[in-house]
Structures are given as structure tokens and as C-alpha cells.
Amino acid sequence: MQIKGIRPWLRQEMEKGRLYVTLAELRSAFPEQTEANLKSSLTRASADNIIANGWQGFYLLLPASYAKRRGLPPGLYIDGLMRYLGKPYCVGLLSAAEIYGAAPQQPMTFTVMTSNPPPRNRRNSNSELVFVAKREFNKGIPDELLRKIKIKTGYLSVSTPEVTALSLLQYPKVSGGLSHVLTVLEELLETCDFSRLPDCIGEYIPISCFQRLGYMSECILKNHTIGEQLHLHLIRHSKGRYQAIRLDSSAPREKKGFYSKRWKIHINTHLVSDSDDT
């Protein structure tokens, strides 16, 4: 039996366990309704906290537990949104680290890595949805770089712990700075194994990230196992011909600063973990 009325239809979809619908679905369900009537009904439903505008033509369904918040946690709908937008994605950086239990505090943003051009960042009453464009993802994201995490609404594509750790070094500003990255790495590295990286990793992660992660793991965090794994990767895949870089690419190189020959890094900043009380 066809449901009469947009609100009953929205509630029926919620009862099915759905958390989002599209304008195209509404047009299909109510072909007799004009565009103006559909949008007017959606506006009233939004005012009554039945739905929230997730994107143009993409609406979030708000169960009673989320109605007062006027939104949903991005992790509950990001997979559906990115499929709606037709863009490859993975939850990355601090948001991925949190999923792996390595975030010392809940990130203020939910970070999604995707292809160029990225969607605009979006803020609601709960959190900010931040998109980081990675041009290497323009050709898609290999499954080897992802983990599919099961959630109550389906699955979430998340960068692997190894890709997450390396990406934190590629985008330190988005990740709270190098000292905060160091804090996250203390726990994240416990879930990493760099001895079995996919062959395609070099096409997606700059070699400088391996250098910085290797130095920070071995020389600061004293994780010699991870350090050796990363150094072996550098030797095998670059034949030792990687260039000298600065630890902090945003800071000038100190003329009298320490230089690590093993990692070919000019140590131009002093990193202290946020968890270090000294």
C-alpha cells in the first residue's frame, strides 16, 4: 500500500533503519507532487527536526535520539553521501586514528580524504565535516589502502593504520601539528605493520612521509621495529636515493641543527608529545 504524505513516508524509511534519503527518491515516491510542494514539505519537516539538510538533494533522517541535535554524526552517513556525490573516499587522518583507538581526544572535525575537486567543508551543530583532496585519488582508491569497517548503517571505508600514520605526516597542519601527530603515533603504531605494504603505496604516499615517520618512530618514540620496517622500505623502493628534507617542512632549516644521515632529515624543530608531562 502506497504511503500517503511525505512525513509518513519519511518515518517509514526511518523505521526501515535508513538514515538518509535523496530528493530523487522523493520525486519517484510522489510523482504527483510538484517540485515546489516537495521542497515546501521538506522545509517543514526540517523545521520540526524530522530531517536535516545533509547536502543539496541529500537529506538526513533524524531518529528521536538525534532530533534535538538537528544532525547526525558524519560517520553514520558519509558512505551514502560520497556515493551520492560519486566520489571515492576514505575516512582519514585523526578521524581514522580515532577509529583505531589512537586519538587522545575526540577530534573536533570528521576528516574525509577524497579526489579533486573536494566538496566544500560543512559544519552542523554536532561537528565539522572536512574534506582533504588528494590528487592521487583522482584515479580511485585501491582496496589495499582501505579497511571496511562495519557500522550499523553498513560499511565505512577507512584508511589502513599504516596509510593513516603516513598521511598524518603528509598533512600535519590538518592534523593539529607535528607534536600532536607524535602523540597520536604513540598508540597508532601499535596497530601498524610496515613490513607488508602494498606495492602501489609509493604511488599514493610521498617518500618524504616514510622518512619523517621513520625518524619519529625510531629516534623519538624509540620504536625500533617500526623504524627498521620503514628503513627497509626506503632502501628497497628508492635504492637509498631519497633526498634530504626538513623534519618540519613549514620551518626553515637550522644551519647548526642536527642532521640524521640514516633518514636524511634536517632536524629543524623540537617535538614533544602532548602526553609528555615533563
Predicted regions, residues:
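Short amphipathic alpha-helical segments with coiled-coil-like heptad repeat character
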Residues: 34-37, 104-106, 173-177
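Hydrophobic alpha-helical interaction segments
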Residues: 145-278
